[in-house]
Amino acid sequence: MEEKKIKHFLYTPFTGLGLYGGFRGNRWLRNRIKVFKQFVIPSLLAQTEKNFTLWVGWRPEERSNPHVIELKNWLETTPLKSIFTYGGLCFWDDKFPDDVAKSRLATNLHLSIRDLVDEIGDVDYVLMTIQPSDDCYASNAVATIQDALKREDINAFGFTKGYIMNYATGEVSEYNPNTNPPFYTIKFKKSVFIEPQEHIQFAPIKSHEYVANHLRYGVLDERGFLVGTHGENVSTYYNHPFKGNWVDKEILWNFGLQNAGTLKLPISLRKRFMRMMPYRVQRKLRYWFGELIWNRFYEYLRS
C-alpha cells in the first residue's frame, strides 16, 4: 500500500491566547521571544525527524511589530522551516460564549489557512501539533507522532506525561497531569483542514482536556514533553500540584536543552512585589487588573 503524504505543522499560537486580549505588551513579547529562542527552538532543532514546519500564529496587529519581524528574520537563518500567519488564534478560545468562539475561530482559520495553502502542497493529510511558545517536546516526539498517526484507527495522538522545568534555576521534575495536557496532534484530511467550517466540525475541541471526547485519540504513556516555567506563565508555575519527583538535569539531553543554560529576564518592581504573594492571589490580581480593567479600557479605545 502506498504511504500517504503528509504535511506536519507544529503550531505555536504566539499571541491571541490568554489574558489581556492575548497580548500583554512589548516587554512581555520580548521576554517570551527570548524564552522561545533559548529553549523551544533548540528542542525543535534537536528533533530526529526533520519533516515538519513550524507555524507561528499572530494576531493581525503583530504584522508590523518590529519584534515579530526580527524573530521572523532570525528564524530564516536557522535550519528550521517556518511560516508566520497573522489571522489570530487557530483553535477554540473558551473565554467567549460558544457562538462567538465558533465565529471567531472560523474567521481566524480563513485568514490563516489561506497563507498556508502553498506550504501545504500536494498531500493527503495535514498533522497539526500544538507547540506552545514556552514548552518543549522530546527530540523523538515528531518521529513518534508521525509513526503513530500512520494508524487508521486513530486521528489524534498525544503524550500523557512529561517534565516541568524552572527555566530560571534549571530545576527539573516529573509532571503528572490528571487531565489531558495540551501536547496533542490532530490528523486532518487536507480537504478538511483547509475549509474552516469542515475543520471546526471535524475537531470541535473547546479545550485540550476534551480531545478524546471528539476524536479517536491515541496516547503514549511516556514523558514526551517539558513544561517551561519562567515567572510570566498565566496558569503554570514550578511548584504546581502536578509536579512529581525531582529528576537529574541529564534528562535535558532528551530535549536538546543540555546547553540551554538558565533564563535571565529583567524583573520589574511590580513583579517583584507580585511574586511575594501566594500564586492564587497573583492570578486573581492579574485577572482583576488585566481582564476586568485594562481590557475594558482597551476595547473603549478601539470603539
Name each model feature, range by range.
Residues 28, 39-51, 73-78:
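Short, acidic, metal-binding catalytic loop of nucleotide-sugar glycosyltransferases
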Residues 9-20, 58-59, 86-90, 160, ...:
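Short loop/turn segments at strand-loop or loop-helix junctions that form parts
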Residues 99-121, 138-218:
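Conserved catalytic core of nucleotide-sugar-dependent glycosyltransferases
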Residues 7-12, 24, 44, 52-58:
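Hydrophobic targeting segments
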Residues 20-26, 58-127:
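Active-site-proximal specificity loops/subdomain of glycosyltransferases
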Residues 189-303:
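C-terminal catalytic/acceptor-binding lobe
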Residues 132-136:
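The conserved acidic donor/metal-binding loop of glycosyltransferases
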Residues 4-32:
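A solvent-exposed, charged loop/short amphipathic helix patch at secondary-structure junctions
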